Design a protein with these regions (language model features):
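Active-site regions of metal-assisted phosphoester/phosphodiester hydrolases
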Residues: 1-136
Length: 136
C-alpha cells in the first residue's frame, strides 16, 4: 500500500511496500536455494499491490521490477499477468497474484471475478483463482 506509515510520518510513500517486496524475494530465493527445498513445489499467492500486466496501472516501478526479476530468477512464474481491463472489460487491473515454481501448470484458464457492485464483496480487489497440476 503506497501510503502505509506515511500519515504517521513513519515512512515515505511506497517505502514499506518496497521493503516487503525485497523481503519476499529474499525469502523465496533462499528457500529455492536450500537443498532441502530446491525440488519443492511452491505456490505464492496474495496481495502484491502492483499490476503486472504491462500497464503500470498501480504499484511502484522499482518494486515491480525487483519482484518480477527476483521471482523469475528464483524459478517462479506468474500466472496473473493478463491485462483483464483489455481482455475481460474489468474496471481495474489484477494486484493479487499467483506465482508458482515451473513444475506447476494451470489446468484451466484463470478464474477472475470483478463485481465491485456486489453488496457482500469481501475486498476492493478483483478475485483470482487457478487450478494447478504438477508437470509430468
Amino acid at each position: 500500500y503506497a501510503m502505509d506509515g506515511v500519515r504517521q510520518k513513519a515512512a515515505l510513500a511506497w517505502e514499506r511496500h518496497q521493503k516487503a517486496v525485497d523481503d519476499v524475494v529474499a525469502d523465496l530465493s533462499d528457500r529455492r536455494s536450500d537443498p532441502e527445498f530446491v525440488d519443492s513445489r511452491i505456490v505464492v499467492a496474495g496481495d502484491f499491490n502492483t499490476s503486472l500486466d504491462g500497464s503500470n496501472w498501480y504499484g511502484h516501478p522499482g518494486a515491480r521490477s525487483r519482484l518480477v526479476e527476483g521471482l523469475n530468477g528464483a524459478g517462479f512464474q506468474c500466472h496473473t499477468r493478463e491485462n483483464i481491463r483489455l481482455t475481460r472489460a474489468a474496471d481495474r487491473a489484477i494486484v493479487d497474484h499467483i506465482w508458482t515454481t515451473a513444475d506447476l501448470l494451470p489446468v484451466e484458464p484463470l478464474h477472475i471475478w470483478c463485481d465491485r457492485s456486489h453488496p457482500n464483496r469481501l475486498s476492493d480487489h478483483n478475485g483470482v483463482a487457478l487450478s494447478l497440476a504438477a508437470k509430468e
